[in-house]
Each structure stands twice: as C-alpha cells, then as structure tokens.
Amino acid sequence: MKTYKVAVLAGDGIGPLVMKEALKILTFIAQKYNFSFEFNEAKIGGASIDAYGVALSDETLKLCEQSDAILFGSVGGPKWDNLPIDQRPERASLLPLRKHFNLFANLRPCKIYESLTHASPLKNEIIQKGVDILCVRELTGGIYFGKQDLGKESAYDTEIYTKKEIERIARIAFESARIRKKKVHLIDKANVLASSILWREVVANVAKDYQDINLEYMYVDNAAMQIVKNPSIFDVMLCSNLFGDILSDELAAINGSLGLLSSASLNDKGFGLYEPAGGSAPDIAHLNIANPIAQILSAALMLKYSFKEEQAAQDIENAISLALAQGKMTKDLNAKSYLNTDEMGDCILEILKENDNG
C-alpha cells in the first residue's frame, strides 16, 4: 500500500477549522483507493510566532522537507500586524516556503458551478456557456524579481525571463491541459514587450511536443476583457508572473466566493504546496461558518498533481458539485439558509460514501 506523507500546516484564523474538514475527506478517499496518508501537523504563521517566536521554524521546515507535499491553511491576522512587515505571518512563512522548495508554478482553478450562478457578478447568459478555467502563473521570475530602482525623478523595474524558466512553466500548462479540455492560451503583450516575444518563441517550441493540445495566443488586455465577456473560451491560461497575478485575481472576482478558490504551487519534481486562495478571516474564525470547500479542493489538487491520483481528485470535485446542486451551502453562498463548516464537510463526505462502489 502506498503511503503519502503530508505536512499539514493549518495556520491561523479559519485555517484549523477548514483543514479538519479536508483531512476528513482525504482519510475516506485513502480508504476507498487503497492508499494511506501520514499526516504530520505543525504550526505556521501567527500560531508559530506565538509558540516559537518565528512564523516558520526550522523544525517545521524540516518536517516539510521530509514530506511528499504540503497542505497549507491560512496565516495572518490583526494580532500580528504590529510586527515589522518582514516578520509578519504572511511574509515570513509562505514566501520562504515557496523560495526554499523552488515552487515556480502557481495553479489557480476558477469554476462557476451551475447552482451558484447567483453568486457570480457575471450575467447568466455568459455563465451558462460554462466557466472552468485554470490559470497557470510563473511564480519566481519576471518583473517582481528583476533589478529595480526608485529615484527622486525616475524609477524602473526590469522584467527578465530565461528560456528555461518559460519552458518549465509551459510544460506544466500543457500537461494540465491534457487532463482538461486540451486548450492553452498564452497570455502576453508580444506587440510591445521583448520578454513576451521570447515567451511566444519558447512556448511555440514546447507545443511541438504536445500535438494534441490547441495553443492560442492572446494579448493580456484582451484576456482581461474576455474573462468577463466570454470566459467559456478559456481552458488553461498560461501567464507570466505579473499577468498571472492580475488575471488570477480577476478570475477570483467572477467566481462568486473566496471560499471556493483553491491553489497549488509546484516545483519541477512534483512537490507542491496546496492552499485556499482566500485569507485567514479571523473575524469568523470561531463562528463555525467558514466555507471549507476551497481547502477541500486544494486537497484534491494535491491528489491530482503531487500523487497522480486523478480519479480520487475527480471524486471529490464531483461530490462538491453535487452538494452545491442539492442546495447545500455555507453562509458566504446563501446567508438565508446555510450549513456550518463541519456540516458542509459532513455533507460532502456523505455524498462520497453514497457513491462509493468499492
């Protein structure tokens, strides 16, 4: 029996609450598919600052190094806002983990469920065409990491990308498209940026190894418009760091709730950090009303990308779709009639059990 070692870093705010539901789902999935998990929990973020004086301890980092993947909750809160910026939970835990494990690829899915069209700001006639997008963003290069200078009369930032950096993120996008709808849009600004011209050259070359995938190009300004005007045309969106940062937040806005947004950050060895895209929401941390779906979907991404358990991941996604279709929702999705955090997790678990043919 295969055993997957997972570093469980629940963190602060709603993190521990929603993490509990994700682990509940994973435990059942492991039984169904005849593998096992070794969950090793550790403090991260503000909880780690309170316990050890630092947001990411050496012990926690070592635990992550000994694991096959990291399942991350959320960090931060007003309690630690008085600390210097570089010591606060968000800056001093997540960023060092990304750097240490060279997590260069960020994957952000955006799916609008038929039962949640009321939560999206988009018109029904747009949503009804189907919205299921994966934004693949390069995370460790580009303008955020280039040479910069802020002077009295002028300032500059430099965007530098190497062929190697572009090729490895492109392959992540094409491999992702193979288990989706087999289409990749490269989002760039090749009409004015030299770096975007290089992106086109490298991605076109990589595409030769993926003859089954349809590659299209789109300028970033047009892409920003099409996301709200005609999002059904997209499957996988491949973006540089800057463009991916902006467009993934736009995708979050059309989704309807941060409680539905999962993400994965991967390196070239298949190791990944999986986390909800929303924050720690300290204001509702003790109310048992947080939406656990983003955390559960992050666990499904872990199954899919780090452990290659695609069918197990699909089971979880299907169960969530069915629960929502049955009108089972948390307060962020339906303030008039809603389930608590643990009730939502139980509902998804029961659907998984009902559909268990094993």
Swiss-Prot record:
Domain of life of the source: Bacteria
Cofactor field: Mg(2+); Mn(2+)
Enzyme Commission code(s) on record: 1.1.1.85
The protein, known as: 3-isopropylmalate dehydrogenase
Binding site for Mg(2+): D221, D245, D249
Function: Catalyzes the oxidation of 3-carboxy-2-hydroxy-4-methylpentanoate (3-isopropylmalate) to 3-carboxy-4-methyl-2-oxopentanoate. The product decarboxylates to 4-methyl-2 oxopentanoate.
Record-annotated site: Important for catalysis: Y144, K189
Species in which this protein is naturally found: Campylobacter jejuni subsp. jejuni serotype O:2 (strain ATCC 700819 / NCTC 11168)
Annotated keywords: Amino-acid biosynthesis, Branched-chain amino acid biosynthesis, Cytoplasm, Leucine biosynthesis, Magnesium, Manganese, Metal-binding, NAD, Oxidoreductase
Transmembrane portions of the chain: none
UniProt gene name: leuB
The keyword Cell cycle is assigned to this record: no
